[in-house]
Structures are given as C-alpha cells and as structure tokens.
Amino acid sequence: MSAKDFLVELGTEELPPKALNSLGEAFLSGIEKGLKAAGLSYAAARFYAAPRRLAVLVEQLAVQQPDRTVNLDGPPLQAAFDASGNPTQAALGFAKKCGVDLQQIDKSGPKLRFSQTIAGQPAAGLLPGIVEASLNELPIPKRMRWAARREEFVRPTQWLVMLFGDDVVECEILAQKAGRESRGHRFHNPDNVRISSPAAYLEDLRGAHVLADFAERRELIAKRVAELAAEQQGSAIVPPSLLDEVTALVEWPVPLVCSFEERFLEVPQEALITTMQDNQKYFCLLDANGKLLPRFITVANVESKAPENIVSGNEKVVRPRLTDAEFFFKQDKKQPLESFNERLRNVVFQAQLGTVFEKAQRVSGLAAYIAERIGGNAQNAARAGILSKCDLATEMVGEFPEMQGIAGYYYATHGGEAEDVALALNEQYMPRGAGAELPSTLTGAAVAVADKLDTLVGIFGIGMLPTGSKDPYALRRAALGVLRILIEKQLDLDLVAAVNAAVEQYGDKVKAAGLAEQVLDFVFDRLRARYEDEGVDVAVYQSVRALKPSSPLDFDQRVQAVQAFRQLPEAEALAAANKRVSNILAKSEDEVPPNVDASLLVEAAEKALGSAVANAESEVAPLAAARDYRAALARLAALREPVDTFFADVMVNVDDAAVRANRYALLAKLRGSFLGVADISLLG
C-alpha cells in the first residue's frame, strides 16, 4: 500500500511556556491514538513545538485504510430453522437486520453468520477528524474564546497547515482553514512561509528564522550557554525546568552575557539566583569555587544588529530586583535573628496545634533529646531549634519563600552563632525531595528529624491523616526524610522513644491514646515502598517488620542481612522449617518449657539438633548483640542439615508428655535463634 508524509501545524498566539512541551507530546499522542484506531499504518511520528506553533509530522502514512471483514453472528442453527428445515422468524429477522436475503447468510457454523467486507476509506478524509479530536483532548486546564467565535483553545489560533504528501488536506479546524502557508519569526520574517512538503517543514521554517524543533532549540541553548559561561571563566546553573521554559519562550535563541554590580554579591547568592531564575529566566554563573559571578546569560528571541542594546536592557531590568533583595537583607540584619521569634507568636502553624513559635519550642526540646542520643551536641541542637523558624518572619523570606532556612543560616552566621547551629537552620528542611541532600551535621540531623516528627505527631494527633493523593502537610515526605537521615547517616535512634517524647511535648493539644503507635506504623510502612524501589522483596521487609525493631538503622541492617541470607542455598529449606516450627508451636496446647532437658532427648536426630542449636545459640547471640546480623544468619544456615534430619526422623507429638514438651522447647530454641534477626518463616 502506498504511503505519504503527513504534516499538521496549528499556529497560535504565544503558548504558555511551562506547558509547551507537554502540549506537543499530548498532541502527538492524540494523533497516534487516532491513526491506530483508524487502522492507518505509519513509519514514525514526532512533534514540534515553538512559542507560536504546535506541529506533528507523520512519516510514510498509509494513504488508505485496509479493507476489513466484519462478522455478525445471529441465532443458533437450531433456533434458526424448524424441524422441517424451514427458516424461523429469528432467521428471517437476522437476514433483514443484515439487509440481505437469507441465502447470503453463512449456515456452516453453529450460528448463522453474515460476513461483510468493508472497503477502507482514504486517509485524507479521516485526518481532519483525527487532528481535531487530538486538539480537543489536549491537557488544557482552562480554554479561552476570542473575538466573536465559539471555538475554544489555550490561545487564539492564527493559521493551520495540513499537508498529506504535496496536497493540502481541505478542512477547517478551530476557525482556521487549512493551507500550506505558515508564518516565520515575528520580527525577522513576519510574512507567510510556504511549506513545500511535510519533509521540508523544518528547513522551510529555519529559513524564516524559526527553529520549530523543541529538542533542537533546547540543545542549542544549553550548548551556547555552556560556551559563554566558559568564556567568562565560570559555569552556568542550568536547571532542566528553566532550560525547558526558556526553550519554550524563543523561536530563534540568541544567548547573551550580561552583568550586574559586584556590590550585590554581598547579598546571599541564593536570593540573587532565585530572583534571576524565577523572575527573569536568566542563567546564573558560578566560579570554580561555586561562588556567584556578577554576570548572567539571557536568551534573546532575536538576532539583533546591536546586541549591546538587549544586554543593556536586561541589565536595567534586573537591577531593581537585586536592589530589593539587597534592601531586605540589610533590613533583616539590623536586629538579632532570635528577635524575629516574637513575630511568630502571631503566626499559626495549624489552628488546633498552635503557633509557629510554639512549634519552634517543641522542636528545640525534641532536637536536644535526639542529639543527645545520636552523639550530637544537645545544647547546640536546642539553640538551633529555638532559631529554626525565625527567618520565616524576615523580609527576605517574605519576598523569597524559597530562602527559608537559607536566610536563617546567613543571619545566624552574621549574629555569631556556632557553625553547626547556623547550618542546622537550613538543614532542618533536608532532604527537600527524593534523593536530595541530607544534613551534614549531627545538629542539623537532630533538628531535621525533630521538626518532621513534631509535624507527624501533631497532624496525626488531630486526625488529619493523608488520604490517597491528598497529603497537604507532606507527611509521607516527612516520614521518608526521617528514615533517610537515620539510615543513610548511620544514626542509631530509638524511634519509639523519640515519637513518645514528641507526643508528650504536645500535652493535651493531641489525642495521645494510640497516637505513637499510629505514627510509628505510618513511618515504618514507608520503608516498604523504599525497599520495593531498591528491588528488595516485600517478604524480606515483612520478616523484619514482624519483630518491630525500634531503630530504623537497626531495621535496615536486618533487612540487608536477610536479603543476603536469601541468596544462600540453605535459605529456602530453613524458611520452610521455621514456618513448620511456627505452626507446630502455635497449635500446641502444652506449656513450652523455657529450656531443653538434655536427658529427655531420646532420638539421635534430636540429640544432634539439640547440640547444634546450643552451639549456634552461643555463637549467634554475641553476633546479634553486635548487630552483625549477616554473620549471625550465615552461622544459623549451618543448622539446615540437623533440622532436615530431625523432621525426617523424629515425631514431635509423641504420647509421652515430657518428651513432647521437651521437643517443643527444642523447636522454640531453634526458632528463637532466628527471631534474634528476623522471622524468616515469612520468606516462604
């Protein structure tokens, strides 16, 4: 079947930059979905997106649908004909429904069947509907109307190109009649641009100063920004989201280096970077030491004969922004950081849980408690907790919310606070996301864990649990943050005790009954998802969870040991044996003695197992106490042979009550040795 290239381009007013790439992807997805539903084959398809256009190019699209056969089944043969072979009303009705004589109906199968071959339709007649359906399904939160038209789209439409091979596909979509006339760059080539063929689309527009390919523009900008930064003896900060947004703002990108006064470098560089990135869409430059350079890169959408004018204009625009940041910084430094705490007495943390000031007091107490138990400085942790929320009341954070914690660090340093105290004011918010940086100090870790536990206990304590996708207080992230800090920083903290301490600090603000258990279950349940992401089988997690270790670090050490144990050849048999032992002991109506009586060991197999368990117990106990769980399980793996022999040769439930109880005691000792690490019966 013959095929042609297909191109559709919808021209618009400037599209929302943050949504441009996703709109292009959705446009392509919708068209591919429509083509597949129509049975139209093609070789490849891709989208193009620029500020004023969305386009899709489909290569080697079939010019016509294939013919298809439709089978329509009717009544069973026994219902279609009577005993004399005459057609019944059911048969006649089926033939009438199909619009044919009964003679044309297939009677060879168990049911009447009518088969009809439907000729495939030309693709050109189907394409307008496919394109329109895709446009209607674009993820546009709010559509708009323009002029006096009834059509709605994300922005007013300006033109429509639709070519199938060399021919225009005649149609009208979103108030635009299809043609082959596109538009060039708004300033360089404002006139119409004739698209000679779908394959020539990119080059035809390139000649009109338009790079329609989003990926090409993105790569060009990234490359040129890196080159310009290197020329300035620096490196550019290029967040992917900013690069995408800038790419979506320009059709003909021209990066240019601009500068600002060095006096602004006295302001925390994070504030300068925030305002230049978020408000002006500039790429900031850092020196080899990671310090901000007094230069930045803007990406113009025009190739000017006088680029110095564009540079000058951007420098004038950014100056007031930097001046504001400078003003806020100087104003805040006029008073001690701790003085801002008074303002927090009137700032509500949560209506039922009190003010941010009260939260800081609780965080201070809990941070000191935690620091003392992880080897940190309790006094410094308490001080950091007191100061932890002060910067929320500053002018700087009021203008730049992203500066919370960072501003606190600078103001604490300016005020002569200890370095770890100052760092903790920023580190309390770590990790800020999945895989993000963790606190570098014990003081920072203590405050970060305390802050998160305080939030978890408080919100759970008033019954505002996260449900489904709704988690307004980011409790899942808080729980994962606590776990990451304690596990990855190798900090051994009894989380049960810490959560109970957090509950006590709230007093009667929360419903304390069962609260600690609820919070702990929530936190440790987050470990399940963490391990699943790491490829750890859920059974391994459950084998450790059954013991309810109170320290996340201890929990992780056990999980890693069980994961290693599962790779041993003895693991499967011992897991099954432990499950069998668990069932035997659960069904026992006799009281199990605490110790094994060697004089009651009658069979050779039980004597061998008794000796093996006793020896293993003496060796495993110190290993488990030292948390060398991997070595402990490796030692217990040697019990496989005596365990297998015991179950093969020994009847546990004998009539002699004393012997039976002694065998229960032996099995309990065996199981207890493994339970010092995990319940491996759950691995089966």
UniProtKB/Swiss-Prot annotation:
One of its GO terms (biological process) is arginyl-tRNA aminoacylation. Its EC number is 6.1.1.14. InterPro entries: DALR_anticod-bd, Gly-tRNA-synth_bsu, Gly-tRNA-synth_heterodimer. It catalyses: tRNA(Gly) + glycine + ATP = glycyl-tRNA(Gly) + AMP + diphosphate. Keywords: Aminoacyl-tRNA synthetase, ATP-binding, Cytoplasm, Ligase, Nucleotide-binding, Protein biosynthesis. PROSITE patterns: AA_TRNA_LIGASE_II_GLYAB (PS50861). GO terms for molecular function: arginine-tRNA ligase activity; ATP binding; glycine-tRNA ligase activity. It holds the Pfam family DALR_1. It is found in: Cytoplasm. SUPFAM superfamilies: HD-domain/PDEase-like. One of its GO terms (cellular component) is cytosol. Tetramer of two alpha and two beta subunits. Belongs to the class-II aminoacyl-tRNA synthetase family. HAMAP family: Gly_tRNA_synth_beta. This is Glycine--tRNA ligase beta subunit. It comes from Pseudomonas aeruginosa (strain UCBPP-PA14). The lineage of its organism: Bacteria, Pseudomonadati, Pseudomonadota, Gammaproteobacteria, Pseudomonadales.
